[in-house]
Every structure is written in C-alpha cells, then in structure tokens.
From Swiss-Prot:
Entry annotated with the keyword Lipid metabolism: no
Subcellular location: Cell membrane
Name of the protein in question: Phospho-N-acetylmuramoyl-pentapeptide-transferase
EC number: 2.7.8.13
Topology term for the membrane: Multi-pass membrane protein
Gene Ontology cellular-component terms listed: plasma membrane
InterPro entries referenced in this protein's UniProt entry, alphabetically: Glycosyl_transferase_4 (IPR000715), PNAcMuramoyl-5peptid_Trfase (IPR003524), PNAcMuramoyl-5peptid_Trfase_CS (IPR018480)
Entry's Gene Ontology BP terms: cell division; cell wall organization; peptidoglycan biosynthetic process; regulation of cell shape
Domain of life: Bacteria
Cofactor: Mg(2+)
Organism listed in the record: Streptococcus pneumoniae (strain Taiwan19F-14)
Name of encoding gene: mraY
Pathway: Cell wall biogenesis; peptidoglycan biosynthesis
C-alpha cells in the first residue's frame, strides 16, 4: 500500500509541475487551442483553451507505474496490459487531437479510422493478456464465453473508451468521475490482494488530481482525446483484470448514461423526423441548458459536476454493497 500511495504522490507532483510547463509551451508555440462547435453559448468563451493536457498525466502515470512496478517486482502481466491499453489508446487519442489542432481537421480521425485503431489495440490486448480462461464473472456466477470472450473484450474496451470521451464535455467532469471510478476499483483490488493493479490505479489517481488543479472551472487546459480515450480503455482493462467486468456497468454508470443519452437522442431524432428527447447530448449539456427537466433554470458547470460525481460515488457504494454485503 505504501508503494502505491508513493507512486500516486509522485505522479501528482509531476503533473502539478508538468501542466503549467505544457500550457506555457502551448502558448509560446502559438498553437491553436480547443475549438468550440457546441450550442452551449457559455462554452464559446473556452475557445482557444490549450488541449491535449492528458498527455502530461498519461506519460507521468505510465512511466511512474512502470518504474515503480519494475523495481518493486510488481511488473506483472496485469500491469503490463493495463499500461499497454493506456499507451495505445492514448496514441489513438493523440493522433485524433493532432489532426484537429495541427492539421485543422475538425473531425480528427473519422469514426472508421478511430474504431479500427481501437479494435486493433483490443485484439492485441486479448492475445497477450493472461486471463487464465475465457470466463466472465456476472454477479458472482462464472459464465464460460469461450471464443466469444474476444468479442466481449473488444466491445468493453472500445465502448468504455468512447464513453469516457463523451463524458469529457465540461470542466473537471471526466477527471474526477474517473478518480471516483478508479478509487472504487482500488478498493476491490486491495480486497483481492492485487497490489500490482492497485499501484497503477494510485498512479493514475495522482495524475488526475494534479490535472484537476488546472482543469476545474474555469479550465486552463483540457485533457483532449489523448486523455479521455486512454482513461476509458484503462477502466475497462482494470475491470477485466480484476475479473469483475460487470461492476463497470454500475461503477461507470455516468459513462453509460452519457453514451445511452446520445444513442437515444440519435435514434429518436431519426424515428420522429427531428424531435428530441434531451435538449442536447451528451446529457450533461441537457442539464446545463435546463436542469434535470431540461426546461428549468440552467445549471452551472459546477452543479452539473457535483451531480454526476455524486451519482458516480453512490453507484460505487452500491457496487460494494452488492459485492460484499449481499
């Protein structure tokens, strides 16, 4: 535990120092910041804010995790594969951000390109990950999936990678939501005695807390796809490494809700010829524009943040109740 906490502190400090340096470099190089293409008027003031800040906490967490795991003899297959997903999905996000920021391609990678790269990473993860079988744990019951586990693994990794990406829409929301999710998995890893996984979790929590110092409203930097895609893939990989895949549906309810809102909105829009369920999706924008009902007073970003963080925290506590009390 001491080693894991120490790794978290080091990553926190590295990110705390690294982000200001990153922002300064961004400004001096006169790199065009985040472009705003949303209908939320108050977001237009954020145009030009440095993005790709996730690169800082990602590098810090990966390097610290690797070195500490190596010297403490905890560089297991679990650690290696979680770090692999972080690096690969981070690279996908970096390429997406790079095209948007430097090549001025608003779309970045097109959906097919992004999906292909994410699937490639998922296949490599599956081939090298030593699970010890293709069993899926569902509420304590073991379900043998056989060859179909690879389909599940790809769906899980790609799905949650993109889900966290959708959640990263207002200042601080994704960073602390993931801190809450990682903390929940930290408890599960500790109970299982998987200190190697706990090490990586603490390292990333430290990095995210250091990043949040500059990402809370008003954000001085955004994590970009390089951060959000990597974090979503990490959560999926950790749930698989702990053999508690189903828990991510509850622990990650915020990301599930965000993604489902987009799917519902698009489907309903097509079926009804232009009608909408929500004011705007992902659903955090719906709350921004008109509160819970979408027709009331607009919520501040802080209010939306605390609402979603609260939901994530309660969902984590519910997961513990199901796992350890029921």
């Amino acid at each position: 535990m001491f080693i894991s906490i120490s790794a978290g502190i080091v990553t926190f400090l590295l990110t705390l120092v690294g982000i200001p340096a990153f922002i300064q470099f961004y400004r001096k190089a006169q790199i065009t910041g985040q472009q705003m293409h949303e209908d939320v008027k108050q977001h237009q003031a954020k145009a030009g804010t440095p993005t790709m800040g996730g690169l800082v906490f990602l590098i810090a967490a990966v390097v610290v995790s690797f070195l500490v795991a190596l010297f403490s003899k905890q560089l297991t297959n679990n650690v290696g594969m979680i770090l692999f997903i972080l690096v690969l999905y981070g690279l996908v996000g970096f390429l997406d951000d790079f095209l948007k920021v430097f090549r001025k391609i608003n779309e970045g990678l097109n959906p097919k390109q992004k999906l292909a790269l994410q699937l490639l990473g998922g296949v490599i993860f599956y081939l090298f990950y030593e699970r010890g079988g293709d069993m899926l744990s569902v509420f304590g019951y073991q379900v043998h999936l056989g060859i179909f586990y690879i389909i599940f693994a790809l769906f899980w990794l790609v799905g949650f990678s993109n889900a966290v990406n959708l959640t990263d829409g207002i200042d601080g929301l994704a960073s602390i939501s993931v801190v809450i999710s990682l903390s929940a998995y930290g408890v599960i890893a500790y109970v299982q005695g998987q200190m190697d996984i706990l090490l990586v979790i603490f390292a990333m929590i430290g990095g995210l807390l250091g990043f949040f110092v500059f990402n809370h409203k008003p954000a001085k930097v955004f994590m970009g796809d390089v951060g959000s895609l990597a974090l979503g893939g990490m959560l999926a990989a950790i749930s698989m490494a702990l053999h508690q895949e189903w828990t991510l549906l509850i622990i990650g309810i915020v990301y599930v809700f965000e993604t489902t809102s987009v799917m519902m909105q698009v489907s309903y829009f097509k079926l009804t010829g232009g009608k909408r369920i929500f004011r705007m999706t992902p659903v955090h924008h719906h709350f921004e524009l008109g509160g819970l009902s979408g027709k009331g007073n607009p919520w501040s970003e802080w209010k939306v943040d605390f609402f979603f963080w609260g939901v994530g925290l309660l969902a984590s506590l519910l997961t513990f109740a199901i796992l350890y009390l029921m």
